[in-house]
Amino acid sequence: MMVQHLKRRPLSRYLKDFKHSQTHCAHCRKLLDRITLVRDGKIVNKIEISRLDTLLDENGWQTEQKSWAALCRFCGDLHCKTQSDFFDIIGFKQFLFEQTEMSPGTVREYVVRLRRLGNHLHEQNISLDQLQDGFLDEILAPWLPTTSTNNYRIALRKYQHYQRQTCTRLVQKSSSLPSSDIY
């Protein structure tokens, strides 16, 4: 009686094949040009991948593969790197993709500006409370970076539009809930 041995390969080899088989970003569905591999929400670079020498058979890979995702570089940065608390960057990105006719490059520009601004405001120790009322571009004017100020103002106005749309949708959802005459 002969025992069948399943072929075992290093995890790094499975990942190389996985990387080449992915055609679209797992988050935004954009056609992939350059890929960021992510395991359980953490970016894994090519040096780390080359060190993954655990031997797996096909069944082991099928289980392991569920932990991995291929993202475009943009989504990798957004979803896996620390963001400031000033802006809902991921929600803003989704809004721009789904509710506007902007090209992916333009969406990327607005998101990058807002993320940089959030980091800048954090470094300046600006309080989140200052973002509550009024027009963001006017409220934050004293703290905007001196270069590309108009670009930051435009991004802030787009973000404020996103906030208004989000609030409107929340109000519409809550008003459509059933209510009782008793209360």
From Swiss-Prot:
Induction: Induced in early post-exponential phase, its expression decreases again at OD578 2-2.5. One of its GO terms (biological process) is DNA integration. Disruption phenotype: Not required for motility, disruption leads to derepression of the adhesive curli fimbriae genes. It comes from the Bacteria. Disulfide bonds: none annotated. GO terms for molecular function: core promoter sequence-specific DNA binding; sigma factor antagonist activity. InterPro entries: Flagellar_regulator_FliZ, Integrase_SAM-like_N. During the post-exponential growth phase transiently interferes with RpoS (sigma S) activity without affecting expression of RpoS itself. It is probably not an anti-sigma factor as its overexpression is detrimental in rapidly growing cells where there is almost no sigma S factor. There is a strong overlap between Crl-activated genes and FliZ-down-regulated genes. FliZ acts as a timing device for expression of the genes for the adhesive curli fimbriae by indirectly decreasing expression of the curli regulator CsgD. This is Regulator of sigma S factor FliZ. It comes from Escherichia coli (strain K12).
